[in-house]
């Protein structure tokens, strides 16, 4: 598994539904980037100028909401992940 550094978090992408509630099937280009994911790895936290580690607010297993343009997409062992800074996470569900 990937090990994030600093205040980074690795999130497993949760795909959006391909069909709307009304039954309309969305084309791939009509779907927006997913905004929900499951935390699979957490860094040790950011360092302060004094060298102290700031604790992370999220933990492995949390479901998080993030901005649709946040993070860097990576593919690792056939699975899609996002690498986010903790500040890019808007909420824990």
UniProtKB/Swiss-Prot annotation:
One of its GO terms (biological process) is chaperone cofactor-dependent protein refolding. Belongs to the GroES chaperonin family. Keywords: Chaperone, Cytoplasm. The keyword Nucleus does not apply. Its main location: cytoplasm. Together with the chaperonin GroEL, plays an essential role in assisting protein folding. The GroEL-GroES system forms a nano-cage that allows encapsulation of the non-native substrate proteins and provides a physical environment optimized to promote and accelerate protein folding. GroES binds to the apical surface of the GroEL ring, thereby capping the opening of the GroEL channel. This is Co-chaperonin GroES. CDD domains: cpn10 (cd00320). One of its GO terms (cellular component) is cytoplasm. One of its GO terms (molecular function) is unfolded protein binding. It comes from Lacticaseibacillus paracasei (strain ATCC 334 / BCRC 17002 / CCUG 31169 / CIP 107868 / KCTC 3260 / NRRL B-441) (Lactobacillus paracasei). Heptamer of 7 subunits arranged in a ring. Interacts with the chaperonin GroEL. It holds the Pfam family Cpn10. It is found in: Cytoplasm. InterPro entries: Chaperonin_GroES (IPR020818), Chaperonin_GroES_sf (IPR037124), Chaprnonin_Cpn10_CS (IPR018369), GroES-like_sf (IPR011032).
């Amino acid at each position: 598994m990937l090990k994030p550094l600093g205040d980074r978090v690795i999130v497993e992408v949760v795909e959006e539904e391909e069909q709307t509630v009304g039954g309309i099937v969305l084309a791939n280009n009509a779907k927006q980037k997913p905004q929900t994911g499951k935390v699979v790895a957490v860094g040790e936290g950011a360092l302060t100028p004094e060298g102290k580690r700031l604790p992370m607010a999220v933990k492995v297993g949390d479901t998080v909401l993030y901005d649709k343009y946040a993070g860097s997409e990576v593919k690792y062992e056939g699975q899609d992940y996002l690498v986010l800074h903790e500040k890019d996470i808007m909420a824990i569900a």
